[in-house]
Curated annotation (Swiss-Prot):
One MF term in the entry's GO annotations: arylesterase activity
Pfam family, one: Arylesterase
Enzyme Commission code: 3.1.1.2, 3.1.8.1
Organism: Gallus gallus
Localization of this protein: Membrane
Binding residue positions for Ca(2+) 2: 54, 116, 168
Processing and modification events after translation: Glycosylated.
Chain's gene name: PON2
Name this protein carries in UniProt: Serum paraoxonase/arylesterase 2
């Protein structure tokens, strides 16, 4: 009887493990291959070789690009090199990327930038919020952009017990923001178990100097976050659930769910066209390939444009897609005046004219 019970328990455990493995592979779109969609007027941006994980463009056409992310389980082409913030002026005929100098007093050696967001104050001061992972921790660094000498002045480092595994931020004030925690754990082994078991413990946090609170929860992995042009709605990409959530923002900064748009790909960062309200997102057609270091089968790239997301049937257009021969692991796409920038987690960046 004891042997029968033991065999039954082993069988149940094996069945559960197999079911979790299948669900894990489905969340990563492990079998999907991408059909190419080409854009004719594109070139790789010189100088960006180790990632362009997030991009934010000011209304005047200046684009900030975070580069050099080292993230648990993912490839890095320069694991010992500190991260950087690049600047591009999209008003130029052939825009180039240049590294922004960071003021003294900031630990550049441990700089590991992830998601970014800009905020323009009433006096036209430009603030840059940068998710940072020094020594595999999570902070949000607040900088002031000095356009006259293309530099960043570090103002402060923001830490909090609710900011545990920050992926992206969207600024809503000169020192306040919404942030996504893409996992409950930050330790790589526990993070992997969280993903494998399909735990929905990821969340969104509102931060200000006066108040810090959880405002949304129940995500597999809350990733990119952004705000509508009218400031009424917050958009959140759940990368492992293949969808984008629309949340209504209230006067007390709480969020309530409005709708969810389901996709067939892993949407990473979200960018919003301030003129049209369209959402642009860099996506991973097959997330499993991100974790493999296979030069013969690299992670592919995909860019989606979402129009009228509040409508009953939004329009979703695949603007760009390719198998990784040009760009590996697209994480962001954003537009300005007919120009498209496409960034990646750890690879190159692409400039296109639409």
């Amino acid at each position: 009887m004891g042997k029968v019970l033991a065999a039954a328990l082993v069988g149940i455990a094996a069945a559960l493990a197999a079911e979790r493995l299948l669900a894990f592979r489905n969340r990563l779109n492990a079998t999907r291959e991408v059909d190419p969609v080409a854009l004719p007027n594109c070139y790789l941006i010189k100088g960006i070789e180790t990632g362009s994980e997030d991009i934010d463009i000011l209304p005047n056409g200046l684009a900030f690009i975070s580069s050099g992310l080292k993230y648990p389980g993912l490839k890095s082409f320069a694991p010992d090199k500190p991260g950087e913030i690049f600047l591009m002026d999209l008003n130029e005929k052939k825009p180039k990327a240049s590294e922004l100098r960071i003021s003294r007093g900031f630990d550049v050696g441990s700089f590991n930038p992830h998601g970014i967001s800009t905020y323009i104050d009433k006096d036209d001061t430009v603030y840059l919020f940068v998710v940072n992972h020094p020594h595999q921790k999570s902070t949000v660094e607040l900088f002031k952009f000095m356009e006259d000498d293309n530099s960043l002045v570090h103002l402060k480092t923001i830490r909090h017990d609710l900011l545990t595994s920050v992926n992206d931020v969207v600024a809503v004030g000169p020192d306040s923001f919404y942030a996504t925690n893409d996992h409950y754990f930050y330790d790589f082994i526990l993070m992997f178990l969280e993903m494998y078991l399909g735990l929905t413990w990821s969340n969104v946090v509102y931060y200000s100097p006066k108040e810090v609170k959880e405002v949304a929860a129940g995500f597999y992995s809350a990733n990119g976050i952004n705000i509508s042009p009218d400031k009424k709605y917050i958009y959140i990409a759940d990368i492992l659930d293949h969808n984008v959530h629309v949340m209504e923002k209230h006067a007390d900064w709480n969020l309530t769910h409005v709708k969810t748009l389901q996709l067939d790909t892993l949407a990473d960062n979200l960018s919003v066209d301030p003129d049209t309200g369209d959402i642009w997102t860099g996506c991973h057609p097959n997330g499993m390939k991100l974790f493999y270091d296979d030069p013969d089968n690299p992670p592919a790239s995909e860019v989606l444009r979402i129009q009228n997301i509040l409508a009953e049937q939004p329009t979703v257009t695949r603007v760009y897609a390719e198998n990784g021969s040009v760009l590996q692991g697209t994480s962001v796409a954003t537009v300005y005046d007919g120009k498209l920038l496409i960034g990646t987690v750890f690879h190159r960046a692409l400039y296109c004219e639409l």
